[in-house]
Amino acid sequence: MIKRKKIALIGAGNIGGMIAYLIRLKNLGDVVLLDVNDGIAKGKALDMAESSPVGKYNGEILGTNNYADIEGADAIVVTAGITRKPGMSREDLINTNVNIIKEVADNIGKYAPNAFVVVVTNPLDVMVFAMHKYSKLSSNMVVGMAGILDSARFSYFIAKELNVSVDNVNSLVLGGHGDLMLPLVKYSSVAGISIADLIKIDLITQDKVDAIIERTRKGGEEIVSLLKIGSAYYAPAESALLMIDSYLNDRRLILPCSVYLKGEYGVSNLFVGVPVIIGRNGVEKIIELELTEQEKNIFDNSVKLIKNLVSNV
């Protein structure tokens, strides 16, 4: 009998709960849903378990507040932490969330040192840096989810502007998860046609593209301002799940993720969003793209901000 994969979700809020549901929907493995609020984790787990006879979901789901229950997990997604409220930046969350990540990292190092860890907690590039530092896990096994989400937003806005299927759109966003992210227009396309060529044939204007880039950078803030009492969770959950799926099933997808750089893009000892191949060994390859001078300046400014934010972590 093939042993089922064990996936631990640290944080049973909106994102953690949604990931748990998607794991069961796609039958990726058994789930441990952990939260300091024991009732939330157990309540959501029981609710999902009771849906099994209707949805015909196989696999176990456990709600808990005991880190010992994540022992031997194959993959872990960390969403624990406070979320943004209207008017807050991701950076406003640093002090509180770093302390939360320290505790989570210590327990992952203790109970699941061989797991592939995806960090979702904001500010993302700082939290994944802290996770790597305090968990002592290998850098290829600790990644941050941001670029997939940012790229998805960029793709969606392009598709809506052109009134075409989102299936036709491929895009790529690099850099930090914030206002200095770098949507790469030259590496983005619609049905294989570059955005630059679409501008040339007047299917979209440069002004529209620029507006979409800015909306992408403010994508999370837009949702926070609408929700009032929370932040995005459907798209972040789908994005994190794609990373876990690529790892557990060795799909070797090329995905933009926040990863530890060792000289790539002229950056060392920081986690920054770049395209990578994720397979059964975690981050298997970092893909270095050629950037224009303008793109490099934006990327470097994003890196400077990340470097400043992690200086006291």
UniProtKB/Swiss-Prot annotation:
GO terms for molecular function: L-lactate dehydrogenase activity; L-malate dehydrogenase (NAD+) activity. The keyword Cytoplasm does not apply. It catalyses: (S)-malate + NAD(+) = oxaloacetate + NADH + H(+). SUPFAM superfamilies: LDH C-terminal domain-like, NAD(P)-binding Rossmann-fold domains. Coiled coil: none annotated. Its EC number is 1.1.1.37. Keywords: NAD, Oxidoreductase, Tricarboxylic acid cycle. NAD(+) binds at residues 11-16, 35, 97, 120-122. Substrate binds at residues 84, 90, 122, 153. The active site is at residue 177. GO terms for biological process: lactate metabolic process; tricarboxylic acid cycle. NCBIfam families: MalateDH_bact, PRK06223.1. Belongs to the LDH/MDH superfamily. MDH type 3 family. Catalyzes the reversible oxidation of malate to oxaloacetate. HAMAP family: Malate_dehydrog_3. This is Malate dehydrogenase.
